[in-house]
Amino acid sequence: MNLIQTIEAEEIAKAGKDIPTFRPGDTLKVGVKVVEGERTRVQNFEGVCIARSNKGMGSNFTVRKMSFGEGVERVFPLYSPNIDSITVVRKGAVRRAKLYYLRGRTGKSARIAERRDYRSEAGEG
């Protein structure tokens, strides 16, 4: 491990965030800290993760949701102090790493089937 990777590993450990394991296709609820005047509140942004980039401290993920018939996408830095929480609502079964094709789809064609993890259930019992 070189010096830059060592420094990034220390910064990630110092951030102390508990980030759940998620993949593109999963439905996420991201709690974003919003500052309004002197008050700070948490606003939830719920949508489908369409992309994830793992680059140490520069890791980010893109979440897409439909809001009043319009598609809204936000790119969140994974270790941002403005992210309060990340919750996996539903796991999706997809065969691509980037789901940019969902941008051109609406309605039933934009649905993603739910992923069933049989291996984890078999390991418990």
Curated annotation (Swiss-Prot):
Pfam families, per database record: Ribosomal_L19
Protein keywords: Ribonucleoprotein, Ribosomal protein
Record's protein name: Large ribosomal subunit protein bL19
Organism: Sphingopyxis alaskensis (strain DSM 13593 / LMG 18877 / RB2256) (Sphingomonas alaskensis)
InterPro entries per the UniProt record, alphabetical: Ribosomal_bL19, Ribosomal_bL19_CS, Ribosomal_bL19_sf, Translation_prot_SH3-like_sf
Family to which the UniProt record says this protein belongs: Belongs to the bacterial ribosomal protein bL19 family.
Reported function: This protein is located at the 30S-50S ribosomal subunit interface and may play a role in the structure and function of the aminoacyl-tRNA binding site.
Molecular function per GO: structural constituent of ribosome
